[in-house]
Regions:
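Short, small-residue-biased leader/transition segments that mark boundaries at the very start
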Residues: 3-10
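Transmembrane beta-strand segments of outer-membrane beta-barrel domains in Gram-negative
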Residues: 12, 47-51, 58-61, 118, ...
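Outer-membrane beta-barrel initiation region
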Residues: 12-202, 278-283
């Protein structure tokens, strides 16, 4: 934050005046239009603001007419950074007038959007003591600021393949190939997404996070089984203070089903009941709560 024209009037305290936000596109597009809503004027490029005004306004912890506070300034900057959609954001303060007794500062925020997409491709090679080896890959793609809500929509696709490097006693290694395929989708918000919560409770000075996730995977273990798994979670994280953290998972579902088993696998699990239960068909709904201090 910086004070413009501070040489005009020096005071021990100031009040907040008008707030203007200038949003520059990730390609450098300068603002060409503006919209006025309570407490703020938003300048943007294109047909509509790059972020919904209501989402942005909840990150400002001061109002017009309030006494300027460094703490509110810090909370505001931290909340904007947690959105994860800006390459940078800066605040400038300027006296509302040039009179010697001026006690009001207008606020200007300049921000540039970050790139909307993040992508990652990872390769690996696995070698096991069971004489199986093979490659694997993970591809991840994230869309930031999804639907102008500062949410992140993510997609991940992973796969691996392993083959037997040595033949078995019967000289056949062609049937010993294992593979795994999986995909997941997640939608994450930097706030609590609860329709019954008041706007005041949702506008927190400390981090809040909501996550929705769906996943599915296909696992084939050579000479043993083929398993299909899928499930999903809904999770909330929030901090009422800097040191207290709550994690609430009201919904978690995991479903596993064996699509195919071999005689060898059936013989092994028949002798080990706990293994049979852990690898059998399962439908597991759950919920959890974690408190961190």
């Amino acid at each position: 934050a910086s004070l413009v024209g501070s040489e005009m009037c020096i005071r021990d305290s100031y009040y907040i005046g008008n707030t203007s936000v200038y949003l520059t596109g990730y390609k450098g597009e300068e603002p060409t239009d503006s919209i006025v809503f309570p407490g703020m004027t938003l300048h943007y490029s294109g047909k509509k603001p790059g972020i919904r005004p209501g989402v942005l306004a909840k990150r400002f912890f001061y109002q017009k007419g309030q006494l300027y506070s460094q703490a509110r300034q810090n909370f505001t900057q931290e909340a904007l950074a947690r959105l994860g959609i800006f390459k940078f954001a800066e605040f400038r303060y300027a006296p509302q007038d040039t009179l010697p007794g001026c006690d009001t500062l207008n606020v200007r925020m300049n921000a540039t959007f970050d790139l909307p997409y993040d992508g990652e491709l990872e390769f690996n090679v696995t070698t096991k003591s069971t004489d199986q080896t093979g490659p694997g890959a993970i591809f991840s793609l994230s869309r930031k600021n999804f639907m102008r809500t500062a949410a992140t929509l993510s997609f991940q696709l992973k796969g691996s393949y392993e083959w037997q490097t040595n033949s078995t006693a019967d000289g056949n290694s062609s049937k010993l190939n294992s593979y795994e395929l999986g995909t997941s989708f997640s939608l994450e918000y930097p706030r609590l997404v609860l329709p019954w919560m008041s706007k005041k409770m949702m506008s927190s000075r400390f981090p809040q996070h909501t996550s929705f996730k769906l996943y599915a995977s296909q696992l084939n273990r050579a000479r043993f089984f083929k398993m299909l798994s899928f499930g999903g979670t809904v999770s909330y994280d929030f901090q009422p203070s800097r040191v207290w953290k709550h994690t609430v998972t009201p919904f978690r579902l995991a479903f596993n089903t064996l699509q195919h088993t071999t005689t060898r696998f059936d013989t092994i699990v028949d002798k080990n009941r706990s293994l049979k239960i852990s690898l059998g068909n399962q439908f597991i709904p759950a919920m959890s709560y974690t408190f961190t201090l």
